[in-house]
Curated annotation (Swiss-Prot):
Stated role: F(1)F(0) ATP synthase produces ATP from ADP in the presence of a proton or sodium gradient. F-type ATPases consist of two structural domains, F(1) containing the extramembraneous catalytic core and F(0) containing the membrane proton channel, linked together by a central stalk and a peripheral stalk. During catalysis, ATP synthesis in the catalytic domain of F(1) is coupled via a rotary mechanism of the central stalk subunits to proton translocation.
Gene that produces this protein: atpF
Protein name listed in UniProt: ATP synthase subunit b
Segments passing through the bilayer: 7-26
Family recorded in the similarity comment: Belongs to the ATPase B chain family.
Taxonomy of the source species: Bacteria, Pseudomonadati, Thermodesulfobacteriota, Desulfovibrionia, Desulfovibrionales
Keywords noted in UniProt: ATP synthesis, Cell inner membrane, Cell membrane, CF(0), Hydrogen ion transport, Ion transport, Membrane, Transmembrane, Transmembrane helix, Transport
Organism name: Nitratidesulfovibrio vulgaris (strain DP4) (Desulfovibrio vulgaris)
Annotated GO MF terms: proton-transporting ATP synthase activity, rotational mechanism; proton-transporting ATPase activity, rotational mechanism
Length: 188
């Protein structure tokens, strides 16, 4: 409302000073003050009618427009703040990108070393089991060979002993020897 009064006063003063400037000219005849007064009154009546008929709507329009502009400026300020935050976040992430890359590489290297150690450990255990199994197999084969050799040697000793006894002992001595050992076996 105050702005409208100031605008109306400024318009009236502009018309007044313009008419004064026109009147000071060398045209030879003065202005038609009656026509000028009629025009001013006509303008004031026209402006008053427009103000009465649509004054509230005009004020509401400009007030609504003003509030809309203020709201839009607030929204733009909020969006600007959000954009600055997002920009700062992106810049921070870009700055941290190298350290993140190094961390990821270090993590993968550590995982690789762990897998390598697990594979080596498994291979060592498998080699140990294979070596132990080979030792057992070799021991069993040696034991079997020794047992076979003992059995063969026992057979050969028996054959040699029989042959030797058959050559040195007579049948009578042989029977005495058998009786003697049978008596020992029975008594024990």
């Amino acid at each position: 409302m105050k702005g409208l009064k100031i605008t109306a006063a400024a318009g009236a003063m502009t018309l007044f000073f313009a008419s004064m400037a026109y009147a000071s000219g060398d045209s030879g005849h003065g202005p038609d003050w009656g026509n000028f007064a009629f025009r001013v009154v006509n303008f004031v009546i026209f402006a008053g009618i427009i103000w009465k008929a649509a004054g509230k709507k005009i004020v509401g329009f400009f007030t609504g427009r003003r509030q809309g502009i203020e709201q839009e400026l607030n929204d733009l300020e909020t969006r600007k703040t959000e954009a600055k935050k997002q920009l700062a976040e992106v810049e921070r992430r870009i700055a941290n990108l190298e350290s993140e890359r190094q961390a990821i590489l270090a993590d993968y290297r550590a995982q690789g070393e762990n897998i390598k150690a697990a594979i080596i450990d498994k291979a060592e255990k498998s080699a140990s089991l294979i070596t132990e199994q080979a030792k057992r197999t070799a021991d069993n084969e040696i034991k079997a060979a020794i047992d076979a050799m003992r059995a063969q040697m026992a057979d050969e000793i028996i054959v040699a002993a029989e042959k030797l006894l058959a050559e040195k002992l007579t049948a009578n001595e042989h029977e005495k020897l058998i009786d003697k050992y049978l008596t020992k076996v029975v008594l024990n």
